[in-house]
Amino acid sequence: DSFKSFYQNAWPILKEKKIPFIIFVNTREINNNHPNYMTWNQIRELRDSGLVTIGGHSWSHEYFIDMKFDEVKKDIEKSHQDYLKELKFIPDLYAHTFGETSTDLINLIKKFNYKIIFGQHSGVISQSENIYYLPRFSLNENYGKPKRFKNILRSRAFNLKSYEPKTILLNTSNNPTNLKLAFHENVKGINCF
């Protein structure tokens, strides 16, 4: 989300250790010089470092699930204008705001030529993942402690044969839901989180 705290706390460490990463930039608060967000100059510094991939993350960072599709389209178009003006390119990676989406919303966002789209559900990417709803590990003040980061680095993806439900968005008709997983190999001692 391009928070200033990331720039002040994480960026110096990642730069020193030469660890590549993606930062998803929502543009409205940057344009408004919000004190908790990085500036465009700081984002350009990240871009120019060679370690950072800039990803799209909307203009407003609103809950797209609650918006009409024409509003979502306008929001993403505004962010594209900002990216072109400030960074001279439009990102080809995108992260759903709040990680929330639906199949219809994914289909709309795909029309903006994003190669890969991320949710916010934690997990390791496997070959069976939908490239328009990939898991990612968020790192922030609540979920960025060194012990958790080490666990993330040791995580491995399951090689799933199939899973249910296919529905991404839960509502009153499908919640609670039953989760069914089929693995290619025999798996023991699984933890779900």
Model-inferred region functions:
Residues K4-N41, G50, K111, Q127-S128, ...:
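Terminal accessory/targeting
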Residues G99-T101, G123-V124, N186-V187:
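Short Gly/Pro-enriched loop/turn and capping motifs at secondary-structure junctions
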Residues G55, I117, L181-F183:
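Glycine-centered structural positions embedded in regular secondary structure
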Residues L93-H96, H121, E141:
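Conserved NTP-handling cores and scaffolds of large molecular machines
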Residues I106-L108:
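Short helices/loops that flank or line small-molecule/ion binding pockets
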Residues F3-D104, K115, S128-P135:
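Metal-dependent polysaccharide deacetylase catalytic core of the NodB/CE4 family, i.e.
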Residues Y114-G123:
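Acidic, His- and aromatic-enriched active-site or binding-groove loops in soluble protein domains
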